[in-house]
Amino acid sequence: MWIIVTYDIGIKRNTRVRKICRKYLCHVQKSVFEGEISEKNFLKMKGELQRIVNFDDDQVAIYVFDTLRYSSKEIIGYHIDTDNVI
């Protein structure tokens, strides 16, 4: 599956959330990650995030795509190269 993760997190938890997302996805903007992820890793990442997020103050939005067949991405401005990510 392909996912996009965006977040609005309190300062104290921001670094921890970013480190978790970086383990599984490509960092494309300050609070945005995207990439291909297995179901197993998706559930692991979600569990790690749920343990950190303050449900009253923070928000993590995860957009899940089963296929990229009918999708496209347009970037206006500088482009971050994600092709070299393992």
Annotate each language-model stretch with its function.
Residues 1, 13, 19-20, 46, ...:
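Short leucine-rich amphipathic alpha-helices used at interfaces
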